């Protein structure tokens, strides 16, 4: 309702494999020490699901793209500090509400360092989804009819190979 006809919607958010190393390390540590696990990293939407949502809510010319970034830290505790500053602490309803035990946290650090370190630093993956779409308006350009193009796409692609 707030987007005018022919208005451009732009959004970005963390998605899919963001913090996959942290998630893996927390799960392994908690399973080892507690015999089970409580989600410690919020789940992130899949790009395909976001693209489908853009179509379902009738955006014209929807585009969904993803940027992948690897960020390196001296220690997993530095990553946790940055996440807290970003406001990305866990807000899951199903999460165990008791405090994270220090032995679990320390084991998570060990697992993270053992599995995801390179040149003395740990890696954290961040995937950012970018979404754009136009609110429908009758003045928008319409796609051409199938087969109406003047250039064969296969031939056009061969020029760049």
Indicate where each model-derived feature is located.
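A generic alpha-to-beta junction signature in SAM-dependent methyltransferases
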Residues: 2-3
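Conserved catalytic/acceptor-binding region of the Class I
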Residues: 6-75, 86-98
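C-terminal lobe and adjacent flexible extensions of AdoMet/dcAdoMet transferase-like proteins
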Residues: 52, 57-60, 74-161
């Amino acid at each position: 309702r707030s987007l005018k006809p022919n208005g451009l919607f732009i959004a970005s958010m963390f998605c899919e494999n963001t913090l996959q190393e942290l998630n893996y390390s927390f799960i392994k540590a908690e399973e080892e020490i507690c015999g089970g696990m409580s989600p410690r990293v919020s789940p992130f939407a899949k790009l395909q699901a976001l693209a489908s949502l853009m179509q379902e809510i009738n955006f014209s010319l929807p585009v969904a793209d993803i940027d992948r970034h690897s960020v390196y830290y001296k220690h997993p505790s530095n990553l946790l500090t940055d996440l807290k500053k970003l406001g990305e602490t866990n807000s899951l309803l199903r999460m165990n509400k008791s405090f994270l035990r220090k032995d679990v946290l320390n084991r998570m650090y060990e697992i993270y360092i053992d599995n995801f370190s390179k040149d003395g630093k740990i890696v954290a993956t961040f995937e950012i989804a970018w979404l754009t779409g136009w609110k429908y308006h009758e003045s928008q350009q319409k796609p051409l009819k199938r087969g109406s193009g003047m250039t064969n796409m296969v031939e056009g692609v061969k020029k760049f190979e």
